[in-house]
Amino acid sequence: MAAITAASNSKQIAPLPKTLLQAAVMAIELDKPICLDYYVASYNKDCKIARDGTEGDKFLYKNPEEYTSPLKGMFKVDPGPDSQDSSYDLIFETQNSIYLASGNML
């Protein structure tokens, strides 16, 4: 088994454990895959929630080639009362997938 080694100076960007647990429960109940491809972009504020026209569907948007299908639901996940961290994550449900994003994007 290969090990993943990170430089001690680099900061690991990953969803909160509570977010991963909630997403896993949703994925099992809804029979949808969990997608993390917007997490780092959302952490770096390189993606946003966009709308198709003034009354159209909302979706996650990185660029003209990378965007999700319309959003069916959005859920905020706080780190919990014992955490010193004020950051939070977001879970987005689309027709086919569950996307995790950092609250930094808002």
Where are these regions (language model features)?
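N-terminal non-globular leader segments, chiefly Sec-dependent signal peptides
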Residues: M1-D89, Q95, G103-L106
